[in-house]
């Protein structure tokens, strides 16, 4: 159950990686 949720969240983060990169730092 936890593995499936992590994979779906990684796919969504990959799409907003540009905006998340500036918020990460």
Swiss-Prot record:
Keywords annotated in UniProt: Ribonucleoprotein, Ribosomal protein
Example of a GO biological process term: translation
GO cellular component entries: ribonucleoprotein complex; ribosome
Region (Disordered): 1-25
GO molecular-function terms, A-Z: structural constituent of ribosome
UniProt entry tagged with the keyword Ribosomal protein: yes
InterPro entries: Ribosomal_eS32
The keyword Ribonucleoprotein appears for this protein: yes
Family: Belongs to the eukaryotic ribosomal protein eS32 family.
Subunit and interaction comment: Component of the small ribosomal subunit.
Additional comment: Initially thought to be part of the large ribosomal subunit. Crystal structures show eS32/eL41 to be a small ribosomal subunit forming a bridge at the interface of the 2 subunits.
Identification of the protein by name: Small ribosomal subunit protein eS32
Gene source species: Glycine max (Soybean)
Name of the gene encoding the protein in the UniProt record: RPL41
